[in-house]
Amino acid sequence: MSASETDRWAWLLVLCFVFGCNVLRILLPTLSSFISRVLQKDAEQESQMRAEIQSMKQELSTVNMMDEFARYARLERKINKMTDKLKTHVKARTAQLAKIKWFISVAFYVLQAALMISLIWKYYSVPVAVVPSKWITPLDRLVAFPTRVAGGIGVTCWILVCNKVVAIILHPFS
């Protein structure tokens, strides 16, 4: 394929990239949750701690407070200590999960921005499509930016339009 043939298909390339980025943006929370779960294996330890707390609470319910106060108090302190330990463990895991999700989101948006900038750089002087100039008469210079071709649709305008259209189409899925 020659350079002029690839320039002719620039509109489809931009549309595909914009569509892909918007689909990934919708799937970003699910994707980051999955990656976080893969990276964190502490949930098993938390469920084990919860099971221990439940068994101790069941044992506590069988102990008579009046007859065996020392055993009852010891078991209650043990439950409180284990509950506090579980709470701190959950807080630490939640903070780490938030950091992982934030990093994934930032990485995605940086990648998306780099992709859009590279598309604008590559197709800076080439119109993505050319339509009769009377169709876009009041806005022809704005729409043609940065190509300066009469009736041309510049890559920046095309990216904005594609982003809006794809966002509207994918809105029910988000």
Curated annotation (Swiss-Prot):
Domain of life: Eukaryota
Membrane topology annotation: Multi-pass membrane protein
Entries under Gene3D superfamilies matching the protein: Helix hairpin bin
Location within or outside the cell: Endoplasmic reticulum membrane
Key words, A-Z: Coiled coil, Endoplasmic reticulum, Membrane, Transmembrane, Transmembrane helix
Region Interaction with GET3/TRC40, residue ranges: 39-97
GO molecular function annotation: protein-membrane adaptor activity
GO cellular component term, pick one: endoplasmic reticulum membrane
Membrane side Cytoplasmic: residue ranges: 30-99, 170-174
Main location: endoplasmic reticulum
Regions crossing the membrane: 9-29, 100-120, 149-169
Entry's family note: Belongs to the WRB/GET1 family.
Protein purpose: Required for the post-translational delivery of tail-anchored (TA) proteins to the endoplasmic reticulum. Together with CAMLG/GET2, acts as a membrane receptor for soluble GET3/TRC40, which recognizes and selectively binds the transmembrane domain of TA proteins in the cytosol. Required to ensure correct topology and ER insertion of CAMLG.
Protein name: Guided entry of tail-anchored proteins factor 1
Species for this entry: Rattus norvegicus (Rat)
Gene: Get1
